Amino acid sequence: MTEPNTPAAPTGQAQDDNQIMAERREKLAALRQQGVAYPNDFCPTHHAADLHTRYSETDQPALEAANVEVALAGRMMLKRVMGKASFATVQDGSGQIQFYITRDRVGEDVYAAFKHWDLGDIVAARGVLFRTNKGELSVQVQELRLLSKSLRPLPDKFHGLADQEMKYRQRYVDLIVSPETRNTFRARTKAIASLRHHMSDAGFMEVETPMLHPIPGGAAAKPFITHHNALDMQMFLRIAPELYLKRLIVGGFERVYEINRNFRNEGVSPRHNPEFTMMEFYAAYTDYRWLMDYTENLIRQAAIDATGSAALNYQGRELDLSKPFHRLTICQAIQKYAPQYTDAQLADANFLRAELKKFKIDTNAPQFLNAGVGTLQLVLFEETAESQLWEPTFIVDYPVEVSPLARGSDTLPGITERFELFITGREIANGFSELNDPEDQAERFRKQVEQKDAGDEEAMFYDADYIRALEYGMPPTGGCGIGIDRLVMLLTDSPNIRDVILFPHLRRED
């Protein structure tokens, strides 16, 4: 018996899609006349991948003796008709398996109908497992049905969707034809499941906080604005859940976390999407040092659970998450990757402003209204060192003026107990010991309002209710946010954040 490895004759390549669709609609019309266009009474008992796993070592004599009866359904991806016998490769949600279809077993009428079925059709079969002469596990079909007619032709099997934007716009087609895309989103699910599992093991409670905020807060970002008709008030899609999660710490839940969407009305890039997924978690009686240790272990374990290893390959370069993550201050990172800068220069605000002009940074912009040396150092770090942080690196000791929610250092004036984690030159996580002094927090909010009044659209609003919550007393707390999309990019070797978001936003089709 011969096995197929090629699709049906490429008639679709010589015809435009409209003609193909017209022909398929005629076939659908005939099915409607027969009253069997879209049946819904077939229940699969098995999945392809499970069968391949379970019977991977079972030879044909053993399969014949076992008489393994199966019922499977899926999309027909390959088809080869050879007289009285045919082969079809069917793809279900787990993988692919081959059907062996003969006229004698399924009957002349069904076999004749099968010849006119198209690639992309959803089909179902009952039969028994066997191995072909070449050793491929297959289903010897005894009953065959068409469950759903595909009206649009699939892309060429060898090239898939060549247009990258079309992959994003028609993700459903991309998922049909690309096993790599399917594996990416399976890995995403595994990574998130890993995070949830380990958060639960550590005593964290998963919660849900509002997506509509009366005051945007928790991050420096430009919000999306909407209107609540029933309350007749302006609302904002949340830019971060932070202030609500810390209200829960005040309320007595000592360890909380949330995995959900944030929205920031800002630019789109290979690492930025206006709608993205974050995990934020807060633990009472911890600080930023504890957070760094915990975050490191969390990410390492997510890699193992999602990919099977902490040793990754990202865009052609090796990356080993099993090694201890590096820890550097902002100035240490600058001097590591731009050693021409001296300690004295990095402490000189005038020098830093002049240096930043070389990078075309406008230090007279509103966001630099209250910029001290620390802020200028941070911007220089972003220009000289950030993109070079390939190995996992915690950058610590952020200036207070860019960390309005972080606790100040007890030993370093103007510095906060804050870190950001960078891997492959991208920020993956941001965390800090939380500011729980209501008077200090109120003053920092006031300074943020000054920056906003001066034109800084990303400066924070004054949140009086959050101050009121802090006035009841919040225990010492550490909090961290992990970018799920960027983490999945790392774990799946994806160069663009849109590769790991099922339906990223795109411009309207013309």
Curated annotation (Swiss-Prot):
GN (gene name): lysS
Family: Belongs to the class-II aminoacyl-tRNA synthetase family.
Source species of the chain: Ralstonia nicotianae (strain ATCC BAA-1114 / GMI1000) (Ralstonia solanacearum)
The protein's Enzyme Commission number: 6.1.1.6
Family matches, as SUPFAM superfamilies: Class II aaRS and biotin synthetases (SSF55681), Nucleic acid-binding proteins (SSF50249)
Cofactor remark from the record: Binds 3 Mg(2+) ions per subunit.
Swiss-Prot/TrEMBL cofactor(s): Mg(2+)
Subunit structure: Homodimer.
GO MF annotations in UniProt: ATP binding; lysine-tRNA ligase activity; magnesium ion binding; tRNA binding
Keyword set, alphabetical order: Aminoacyl-tRNA synthetase, ATP-binding, Cytoplasm, Ligase, Magnesium, Metal-binding, Nucleotide-binding, Protein biosynthesis
Class in the EC hierarchy, top level: ligase
Principal localisation: cytoplasm
Name of this chain's protein: Lysine--tRNA ligase
Residue numbers binding Mg(2+) 1: 420, 427
PANTHER family: LYSINE--TRNA LIGASE, CHLOROPLASTIC_MITOCHONDRIAL, LYSYL-TRNA SYNTHETASE
